[in-house]
Amino acid sequence: MKIVSGIYGGRPLKTLDGKTTRPTSDKVRGAIFNMIGPYFEGGRVLDLYAGSGGLSIEAVSRGMSSAVLVERDRRAQNIVAENIRMTKETSKFQLLKMESSRALEQVEGVFDLIFLDPPYAKEQIVSDIEKMAERDLFSKDVMVVCETDKSVELPEEIACLGIWKEKIYGISKVTVYVR
């Protein structure tokens, strides 16, 4: 795996072997950014289930100012930290080593781009978006990108957000919510 485009484009990303994380493939990651960008002029990213950190690092590579990455698995945390170091711009990234629910209670400010790829997709995505809405963590132009199995049906609306785009890539479905 590698960063697809932007200032870190072509740099390799480390991933975990096994079933601890399900890294988004380069092809799907590229497609996600073609849906939502493909490039940005600043903004904050929240990656609530970071895995390897590839989505947030790609977002910063393409112009986002900074990213907060949340990961609970210790082995995955080490991979995320290595991938952040690879950028040589570690000050743009903050790794929170905790459960997503705890992170949602602690993060401050608003986010412009949020990635949700939880292990138990539908229920967790709905709960996470509702919690973020309660805490007012969405910028006025927020995009929430949800990656699930293609069989998962997410609600048309959750809290203050509605589906903007939805596409299937192989076994994955990408759903983008906006205000």
Predicted features, each with a name:
Residues 1-179:
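Class I S-adenosyl-L-methionine-dependent methyltransferase catalytic core
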